[in-house]
């Protein structure tokens, strides 16, 4: 009998195994995207803000806007 030589296919746990593999993959991808965002977007933005405010003179810009007539309550 040739049918007795064939092994039975595994039918239990297929979904659990597939979900386990995909959850690990999704976790790895999400960590990669988070690291990419941090170093490609957040860090350069933080550096740009720090560079801007290092030389920022709020009194100077206030006086420029006051002279230009932006503020109605300040003469």
From Swiss-Prot:
Quaternary structure (record): Component of the cytochrome c oxidase (complex IV, CIV), a multisubunit enzyme composed of 14 subunits. The complex is composed of a catalytic core of 3 subunits MT-CO1, MT-CO2 and MT-CO3, encoded in the mitochondrial DNA, and 11 supernumerary subunits COX4I, COX5A, COX5B, COX6A, COX6B, COX6C, COX7A, COX7B, COX7C, COX8 and NDUFA4, which are encoded in the nuclear genome.
Keywords in alphabetical order: Membrane, Mitochondrion, Mitochondrion inner membrane, Transmembrane, Transmembrane helix
Main location: mitochondrion
GO cellular component entries: mitochondrial inner membrane
Mitochondrial matrix-side segments: 1-13
UniProt key word Membrane: yes
Annotated GO biological process: oxidative phosphorylation
Function summary: Component of the cytochrome c oxidase, the last enzyme in the mitochondrial electron transport chain which drives oxidative phosphorylation. The respiratory chain contains 3 multisubunit complexes succinate dehydrogenase (complex II, CII), ubiquinol-cytochrome c oxidoreductase (cytochrome b-c1 complex, complex III, CIII) and cytochrome c oxidase (complex IV, CIV), that cooperate to transfer electrons derived from NADH and succinate to molecular oxygen, creating an electrochemical gradient over the inner membrane that drives transmembrane transport and the ATP synthase.
Biological or metabolic pathway of the protein: Energy metabolism; oxidative phosphorylation
Classification via Pfam families: COX6C (PF02937)
Protein name as annotated: Cytochrome c oxidase subunit 6C
Topological category with respect to the lipid bilayer: Single-pass membrane protein
Subcellular location: Mitochondrion inner membrane
Domain of life: Eukaryota
Similarity remark: Belongs to the cytochrome c oxidase subunit 6c family.
Stretches assigned to the Mitochondrial intermembrane side: 55-75
Transmembrane intervals: 14-54
């Amino acid at each position: 009998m040739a049918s007795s030589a064939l092994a039975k296919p595994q039918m239990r746990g297929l979904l659990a195994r597939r979900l386990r593999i995909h959850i690990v993959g999704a976790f790895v991808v999400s960590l990669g995207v988070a690291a990419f965002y941090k170093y490609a977007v957040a860090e350069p933005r933080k550096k740009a803000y720090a560079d801007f405010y290092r030389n920022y003179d709020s009194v100077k810009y206030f006086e420029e806007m006051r002279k230009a007539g932006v503020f109605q309550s300040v003469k």
